[in-house]
């Protein structure tokens, strides 16, 4: 199977994304010679990886935008029959050490969310994975109000991390952005700042967009 050539420009990326609208995941997978999993319990990232491949994304797991040359991050978003997001959206790993002097403008969250191509996909569990269809894509750039909300949450979360209070941060913190354990394996550990300024071991954390925020974004477009 030949790799997909990355899109040369934004209009080519949007054209590819729009061509997928209404098509089932099984059709896309068959076109690429990929087996559709029975369910997503062990293949949680399968849908996103399939869409990335079909669109010619370049980043893989690197900490940069999926289409770095276009300044675009790709996010698949599972939705229900009413078009509402079914789960939070992973943004990136949260830094837990060496964060002195890190500003919102220089953060990976800010970088990743400058411009996002949202690709909605049917996600209700009663629909077999292969039969789930891709929705109409949305190219989103945060407005000033959205950026302010994201920055405020990020700064509050990072301040608590800097004070060694990462364990006190729950998914309830933040209006639009939350911090959650990232590793599938709860035994996975990484270094973080301790309350005495030293280092301690904790579970890796990731930044996620809350569903109320992504629902608002989808609603602005689809109503």
From Swiss-Prot:
Signal sequence range: none
Classification via Pfam families: MutH
Protein name (Swiss-Prot/TrEMBL): DNA mismatch repair protein MutH
Subcellular compartments: Cytoplasm
HAMAP family in alphabetical order: MutH (MF_00759)
SUPFAM superfamilies cross-referenced by the UniProt entry: Restriction endonuclease-like (SSF52980)
GO CC annotation, single: cytoplasm
Family of the protein in this entry: Belongs to the MutH family.
InterPro entries: DNA_mismatch_repair_MutH, DNA_rep_MutH/RE_typeII_Sau3AI, DNA_rep_MutH/T2_RE_sf, Restrct_endonuc-II-like
Keywords, ordered alphabetically: Cytoplasm, DNA damage, DNA repair, Endonuclease, Hydrolase, Nuclease
The protein's role, per its UniProt record: Sequence-specific endonuclease that cleaves unmethylated GATC sequences. It is involved in DNA mismatch repair.
Biological-process GO terms, alphabetical: DNA modification; mismatch repair
GO molecular-function term, one example from the UniProt record: DNA binding
């Amino acid at each position: 199977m030949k790799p997909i050539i990355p899109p040369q420009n934004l209009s080519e990326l949007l054209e590819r994304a729009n061509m997928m609208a209404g098509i089932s995941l099984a059709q896309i997978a068959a076109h690429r010679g990929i087996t559709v999993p029975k369910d997503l319990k062990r293949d949680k990232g399968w849908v996103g990886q399939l869409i990335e491949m079909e669109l010619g994304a370049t980043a893989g797991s690197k900490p940069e935008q999926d289409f770095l040359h276009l300044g675009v991050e790709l996010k698949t978003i599972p939705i229900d029959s009413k078009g509402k997001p079914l789960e939070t959206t992973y943004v990136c790993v949260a830094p837990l050490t060496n964060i002195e002097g890190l500003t919102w403008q220089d953060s990976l969250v800010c970088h990743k969310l400058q411009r996002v191509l949202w690709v909605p996909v049917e996600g209700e569990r009663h629909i077999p994975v292969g039969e789930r269809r891709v929705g109409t894509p949305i190219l989103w750039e945060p407005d000033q109000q959205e950026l302010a909300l994201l920055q405020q949450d990020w700064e509050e979360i990072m301040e608590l991390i800097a004070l060694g209070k990462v364990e006190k941060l729950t998914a309830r913190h933040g209006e639009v952005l939350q911090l959650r354990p990232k590793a599938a394996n709860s035994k996975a550990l990484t270094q973080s700042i301790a309350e005495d300024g030293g280092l301690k071991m904790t579970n890796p954390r990731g930044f996620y967009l809350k569903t109320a925020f992504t629902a608002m974004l989808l609603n602005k477009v689809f109503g």
